[in-house]
Each structure stands twice: as structure tokens, then as C-alpha cells.
């Protein structure tokens, strides 16, 4: 497959890397650049840097990064062609892929993508079955009676799976999809006795489940006739894994970043109703506990998480367990306590959207405040529990990262123990870091290294200084490169990465007139070389080289080659001494070739 270079350039020019990365990483301005937690490996202290000026990103921990295409390839685990297509769709640039297409009606790049295509194609027919067929009328009425407008149904892509064992099966087969792959995607079930396939979802209202990029990867089928189970979800598949999926994250991401808060609900139905009521930063897990993968992803967007679970005993227990775990992970945890026996959907149905949004805004407690209010009766009447929970709450408050929030929690919690905030503070070890949290350094987190200046440059070895400075000057402009390219033998570089960078610059200037790091990284396909390019970019040398400066670097680099010739001469003399004619011929040929390269 090949994409015209002009299309690639247009997409790159229209895609701002800061906007792109911000969809996945919570970034903070630090000097000239932005920093955040790396999306490619788990970390507690930010080491991922984005340069808006240079349009590149780079992790100083795992070394991954690059321009907008390489970031997209890495974050979505897709090919370069797929990344170009994805970003092209994002900026409304049509991507014409020059390739010989197969005769199949289904053009795909991987099994995973084909599975997603199946889900998205069948969604259109589920929606049609719900809104345009007689068989779907009862399901549609059921939704409408529960406040689902036509606009909301369309927005959420809700549909209806007919009461047929082969509706989905026959449709996908006619479209040319592999039935075994449809089974692996979770759309079909299989009779293990005769290995026949049939629809997994029948006579159910179908709610699409999307990944963080907004692609449909699964379904939740809800009964409307009382059959069990109430909800039938897609099974675990290569594209649908509950421990990684947060419902509504694709829609809520921007609001989460803007509000610097994520609100976690128990179910996707609560999310739909809460979002409709005006609460836009809401997500839910798919019937599973909040996983480490969930927490890692949340961390990249915000450090503030609010739990709003059902107002029953199970909801309270889940809030205490989840909140404790989140607090241990270094997040700021808050709780919205719904009235007894109610969930968000029921609250909205009873009091209306405005009352719900006001309640969410005004009834938010810190996790410590919520916890002590739940345990207040036991604290008041059980002296053993009093001591236990005093220590627990003291520790919980110590885990809070903000001193202001700590003081607020002290004021809220102390009255439940009939002590002053000062007395409660005495129980707290403020210098105790959470068990699973790495404290920030003395500057409050990762400090972006400054570009290497002259002082650091002087500390390098003579050879390394020459090689790095020489390449840095070649990066300034094409004329400098052309003037000096023939002056140096690439094999004289002591650093193999520099040798390859030298070749990269040759390829780059063959197609470009002006050096740009964002474009240059597209010419390398390894993290090590990308790291070398970015490292060279950080060198801060004189604006203009002094007279003969570059020539001096050339001489130093070529001295390494001369040393190689001297070594060959020594070996030639030794071969002559011992009378090895074959070795003499070999070393003589090497010396002649080496001298020709230097002419």
C-alpha cells in the first residue's frame, strides 16, 4: 500500500500534536513544552513531553514517541497506513491508498479491524430494525416510555436484535465476512456438538459499546420482556475486554479534561441518562470492578475522580472498596451519595434534570468525609471500632495530595470522633507516602531536562563532541549538509546511531529543503534512532559556527578513520612478518579501499 506524500504532508500540517496527545494524556505546561504521564507505560511521575513548536512527543522513560503518525501508530497499535487514514478522517482529508485490492467485498488490515467493522455494520441494521420494522415496535415503545427520545436513540445508536437465530449470521455471511471470525468477535454463538453458528443476541434492545476511540467493539443486549438475564453483554474478545473499557469515555474525554474530573457510575444506563441531563464527564465500567488498566487510563486524563454509585447497601460497599483503592493510587477521591434506594436514572426520573445537576454540584464529599459518615454509628457506639477507624481515617487523609483538601477533611472528620482537627492531625504522618504511589521529587514532579548547552557540551569526549556537533550543524539547513556530506565517511562515526542519522539526513534532504524534526522522525523506524534524533535536537550550540568550526569537526571524525588505516597497516606488517600471503592481500585491499573513500 502506498499513500501520496502530499496527502501525508497535508494531514500532518493539519493535525496539531498537542491537540492529538491531549485526547489521551492530561498535559501540563512546563517551560516551553507540555508534560504528562506516558500513555505507553505505567508511571506515577510524568516523563512524557510534547513540543508544540517542533510537533513531536517523546517519553524519557520508555523512549517512545515521534510525530503525529508515530504517536497514533503506537497508541492504537496500528500500521503507518492505518494511522494516516485515521488522522485523515480526523481532519477531513481523503486518503487514497494506492494498492491492488482483493476481490473480496471486505477490505481489512487485520482481524481486529474486521471485527470492529462487523459490529459497526450490524449496528446500522439493528437501528433500522428498531425504528423501521413492525417487529421492533414493542421495543421502541419500551424505550420511549422510559424517556428515550428519537434523537437520543439515534445519538446512542440503540437498536433491536430480532427474535431470530440467523438474522446477524445471514447478514454478515452475505456481506462476505468469515463466520468463524464473527463468532470470535462475540456476535455469534456456536453449538459445540455440531459446530453450527447462531445469533448471540435475539429479541433484545441493543446498546453499542465503544472503545476510547469511539469504535463499536461490543454490545449490551437488554431484555424488554422480562427474560433472563436482564443484560446480556458481549463475551471477552480481542477487541472487547471489560477491564479496559469505560463506557462513554469516547464522548466524555474532552469534558473530563476540561473539568479536570471524571465521574464514575455503576451502569451504562445511568451514564446515558446523566449525560442527557447535562453531566458530560460520566463513565461506567461494564459490570466489573475498576481495574488497574482503568485506573491507569483515568490517571492520564485527571487526578480527580468522583464516585456516584447506587444508594443501597451494595452501592455503599462498592464505594468504600473502590474509593479506598483509588486513594491508595494517589488520586483525589470524592463521593456523591444518592438518596437511599435510588440510582441516577431514578433520581432524574423523579426530580428532573435540573435538580439532578444541582444535586451533583452541591452534594460532593471527600472520600474521608463520606467514609466517616457511613461508619458514624459504629464509631459512636463501639470503642474498639472508634480507635480502628480513627487510625484508618487518619491514614486516608494523609494520602490526600492537596494540603488544602487535607485540612478540609480534618475539619469534616474530626467532629465524628469528638476531637479537634488539630488532635486528628497529630495522628497523621504527613511524610508517609501511599503504599502504591511514588512521591514527587522536590520540584513537585518530573522536571523536563534543559537542552544540552555549551557547559555540558564541553564535558563530552573530543570524538563524541565532534560527531554530535557535526550532525547538529547538518540539521541547520540543506546547503550545509550538501557542502559537507562528501567530507566524512559514515563508517568513521564511533556511534552507530550517528552513522544511521547521517544516512537519515541524506534521505531526508533528498526530499526536503528545510530540516524539521517532526518530518525527520518519519524517516526512522526504531525508538533508539528516534531518541537519538530528539537528543541531537536538544543540543544548544552557537547560532552560527565560527570560522572553520565544521571543518575542525570533520577532521576529528576522519581521524578515527585514519586510526583505522593505521591499524590495518599494522596488521599488514604483521601478516608480512609471518609470511601469510592471503592476509597480506586482504589487508592491502582494505587499505586501498579506505584511502579511496577518503579521496
UniProtKB/Swiss-Prot annotation:
EC id: 2.7.7.101
First and last residues of each zinc finger (CHC2-type): 38-62
Reactions catalysed: ssDNA + n NTP = ssDNA/pppN(pN)n-1 hybrid + (n-1) diphosphate
Note on how the cofactor is bound: Binds 1 zinc ion per monomer.
Annotated Toprim domain residues: 260-341
Entry's Gene Ontology BP terms: DNA replication, synthesis of primer
Keyword Nucleotidyltransferase annotated: yes
Keywords: DNA replication, DNA-binding, DNA-directed RNA polymerase, Magnesium, Metal-binding, Nucleotidyltransferase, Primosome, Transcription, Transferase, Zinc, Zinc-finger
Protein name, as recorded: DNA primase
CDD domains with a match to the protein in the record: TOPRIM_DnaG_primases
Family: Belongs to the DnaG primase family.
SMART domains: TOPRIM (SM00493), ZnF_CHCC (SM00400)
Organism: Staphylococcus aureus (strain MRSA252)
Cofactor(s) needed: Zn(2+); Mg(2+)
Protein purpose: RNA polymerase that catalyzes the synthesis of short RNA molecules used as primers for DNA polymerase during DNA replication.
This protein's record includes keyword Lyase: no
Domain notes: Contains an N-terminal zinc-binding domain, a central core domain that contains the primase activity, and a C-terminal DnaB-binding domain.
Residues that bind Mg(2+) 2: 310, 312
GO molecular function: ATP binding; DNA binding; DNA helicase activity; DNA-directed RNA polymerase activity; zinc ion binding
One GO cellular component term: cytoplasm
Positions annotated to bind Mg(2+) 1: 266, 310
Listed NCBIfam families: dnaG
